[in-house]
């Protein structure tokens, strides 16, 4: 269902379970755990994830995020739970079925989460202003910082 929704696209999957993806050859590129996930962020247009912490890093890119949480209630109530109100704070649509996930992607429902996305970034990445390198250079070469501050 997801493959049909993304016709003409290419999916990059970082597989933990050694799933057989061969029937999707040419459409799905599979990467094992040795591949740095950050390199996949850079070539992606959107993220489909579950409760993974990748949402925090990926939010820095200002790209759409969709959450496929087929086991949401079990995860929340039986397995691990959350450190924050995931359902109300997620920076994108939360789907519990593949049908609703596909519908969310087709209808670009991530656009309905612009405000929540901004709140999420302000909460979890408050220092990100795109000027980190400049700030480091300023500290390294400032008269007050000098080499003794490094």
Predicted features and spans:
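Single conserved hydrophobic/aromatic residue that forms the stacking wall/gate
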Residues: 1-13
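Donor nucleotide-activated moiety binding/catalytic core segment of transferases
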Residues: 17-56
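Catalytic binding pocket for nucleotide-activated donors in carbohydrate/polymer assembly enzymes
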Residues: 19-26, 53-124
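Short, contiguous acidic/charged loop-to-helix segments that flank catalytic cores in large enzymes
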Residues: 30-38, 89-92, 125-127
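C-terminal alpha-helical cap of glycosyltransferases
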Residues: 129-150
